[in-house]
Amino acid sequence: MKTTLSCLAILFIAFTFQSFKGEKKDFHQSVLWQQGTGKYNNYRIPSITVTQKGTLLAFCEGREAGDAGDIDLLLKRSEDNGKTWSNEQIVWDDAQNTCGNPCPVVDEETGRIWLFLTWNKGDDHETEIIHKTSSFPRLPFLCYSDDDGKTWSEPVNMNETCRDNSWGWYATGPGIGIQIKNGPYKGRLVIPANHSYDDPDGNVRKGPYGYGAHVLFSDDHGKTWQKSEPIKPGCNESQVTELSDGTLVMNIRSYNDKHARAISFSKDGGKTWSEIEHDVQLVESVCQGSVLNFGTFNGKPMHLFLNPAVTVARTHMTVKTSFDDCKSWTNAKLIYAGPSAYSCLAKLQDGRVGMFFEAGKKKPYEKMIFVAIEPGELFTPGTVLEKL
């Protein structure tokens, strides 16, 4: 049976390649932010979503250097499928404190764009937050836009319902959330997140702590939110996608020494989750990755997965495709062979694949790059970006 399925998958890819090899390539690339330019010294943590009107919203963190200190949440908009971009917009600047980890979701029923993010005191560092010796905890916040991302509400502290007070570290995404399209939980908004927890057998930052993932979800268009049960052990930054039958899959950065993505399933809209397993088809070097339900392509439901597809370092940004609800990943398209790290995927209004990721010539964090390609290009030979 597995052999038959594999043969069918190969035939489908061959057919797809034949269908598109003569098609004119509609490709463009934009550097949205670059290290050492503008108001900030560094830019990291990409997130991109498509509004109900088809506008692209690209978020990132503007920062001095590392993950602590004065970090602002930034945004650029595109109303022409990524060909041109607006000037930089500051969504949240809280003096010298840290405002980051963007994770937006678009409510397709109301048009409202919800944006989860996390905040902590700028002089607190991750180790202190995990060990609970920081001056203040790291907290989830939420804001929204009703005008296609042009303006945003004041961020609201969501600690009471979205965070367990026994947790140390906390982070939303980074990446995007989803709205469930099928089954009894249709319309539910789901945001992936992660945290650290007390674990006597753990060794996170040389302390008795572990990493866990979870989701936040809302059944009333974002008025109220709940948190799911945790997914653990060794689970950190994550993204969620929906399968054809409404099952949710969490695709997770793993600290379990497997060099592969951790996977967990939910049959109840994200409230509870299965024990983790590791998908050896999706190799990783303990780095964030992104997954997207692209919808139907050539009559088949297609999922995409994007990450640095290596077991060490952060290089070889690669997108893989699945036509069987993430059971198998039958194609790998190299986007950029050089240093590269965090990423986010989007389906553009014109049907192309949008990829927003960190990359550079010497280090992965030199540029924040947006690339848009026709989906058929995923099945052609060659590298999308030979150079930056």
Language model regions located:
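Bacterial Sec-dependent N-terminal signal peptides
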Residues: 1-26
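Asp-box/BNR beta-propeller blade signature and adjacent active/binding-site loops
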Residues: 22-388
